[in-house]
Amino acid sequence: MTKRALVSVSNKTGLIPFVKGLAEAGVEILSTGGGTKRALEEAGIAVVNVSDVTGFPEILDGRVKTLHPNIHGGLLAMRTNDEHIKQIEELGIEPIDYVVVNLYPFAETIANPDASFADAIENIDIGGPSMLRSAAKNHADVTVVVDPADYDAVLASLDASKEEQLALRQKLAAKVFRHTAAYDAMIGSYLTDAVGEENPESLTVTYTHKQTLRYGENPHQKAAFYESRTSSPSSIAQAKQLHGKELSYNNINDANAALEIVKEFSEPAAVAVKHMNPCGVGTGATVGEAYTRAYEADPKSIFGGIVALNREVDRATAEKMAAIFLEVILAPSFSEEAKAILQQKKNIRLLEVAVTKGELEKKLASVHGGLLIQEEDHLGFDDGDIRIPTKREPTEEEWTALKLGWKVVKHVKSNAIVLTNGEMTVGIGAGQMNRVGAAAIAIEQAGERAQGAALASDAFFPYGDTVEAAAKAGITAIIQPGGSVRDNESIEKADEYGIAMVFTGVRHFKH
């Protein structure tokens, strides 16, 4: 009996040589009456219209083409089941042995900011997933292909043993169910967002494999990198690597942290990160000036770190960065001179990525047996309920330093204290179990630079001891959420030492 293949694709990459290979092997080609059929016929391939198989025309602007027993009976009939064969023969249904289908471009449609809700709905494929699932269910007899990357393997299997062919069909069927599940999850997520349902009764997220990593945080841990189907151009997932070795698990985490911090700034800025915490942040009139300040913030910790910048890297800045060992540099662009300088260092990774704030994403965190989901911490200085509870108000210079510290401290692991002047961080205390301990670390790191600096705290002071430590170090201004039952202690201490203190009403815990 002549084998038959039903072909209907939106992605025509590699299609013609693949279908020619099937046809040369004696496979009869069926297709719907759209672009796929035209492309095949223009390539000289004989094609049978699906309407001739079903005896029914395409209707409803093409919404119904293949939803017919002559198609699904041919896909689902088990070749080893005599009753199945008898039934399809009595009904004049012929088996279909290959299904080559990929789906309407729903992801691409919703990624287009100009696409309407109606456009999205029209790009929900119905017939395609139905054929894929029928074929995948009956993979004992049917070869189903959803990915052009598998075309060569299918052609090669034509001369393989039955066992090898079955193994390939099983592999392809598993891919199909993953693919259709991801497709449906994406549609479900889009419609859920459209109706504003915040916590649906079930949550399905879908990502595509981007990279198998050498290992995870440590060499004994296996790891991989997956990309959201709706990732932003301003994301590590869409960063373009211009130079260097493959990114590691830790590189990706740290680069993501650096990118999210540098997005906080509209002026030229540079951020150095180690272990997902900033070790130095600088701003300036130029990106070179900003990098110099980020480096000077902590020249020891930046070694082997990740640096993110929000302006093009020029020759002068590249020369400065080339003077030390850095794992990753990411920026919106690199001048040709800068690339030539940095590419001389074989171990450095250069990433080109848009540095703009995009749409807010949900933050996911896995716990054993479950998943936590929350909104991004997107609130900035202007989003708070700003008030000054102390007798003295900040000077203009102090306001500049306080705002810089507030931008940075939300990205530091709690308990977090950040000391700044108006141009750079001078001390960072991260991840401490008590706030006064975090302040002590930041103050020690700052040394003499604590004199006249501003202090930012991610959460309120439970006692007045942190204010007292700040005063003794010469800090003149503080920004914190406020809200402690003992706020009066901190306010009294600040007034005692002439410190200007700002309450924002916004907490920035980070775990």
UniProtKB/Swiss-Prot annotation:
InterPro entries assigned? AICAR_Tfase_dup_dom_sf (IPR024051), Cytidine_deaminase-like (IPR016193), MGS-like_dom (IPR011607), MGS-like_dom_sf (IPR036914), PurH-like (IPR002695)
In its keyword annotation, does this UniProt entry include Transferase?
yes
Superkingdom of source: Bacteria
Q: Which UniProt keywords apply?
A: Hydrolase, Multifunctional enzyme, Purine biosynthesis, Transferase
Identify the SMART domains for this entry.
AICARFT_IMPCHas, MGS
> What GO CC annotations are associated with the protein?
cytosol
EC number(s) recorded for this UniProt protein = 2.1.2.3, 3.5.4.10
Q: Where is the MGS-like domain?
A: 1-146
A Pfam match is MGS
Q: Which family does it belong to?
A: Belongs to the PurH family.
Cited NCBIfam families: PRK00881.1 (NF002049), purH (TIGR00355)
Report what the protein is called: Bifunctional purine biosynthesis protein PurH
Show the taxonomic lineage: Bacteria, Bacillati, Bacillota, Bacilli, Bacillales
Q: Which gene encodes it?
A: purH
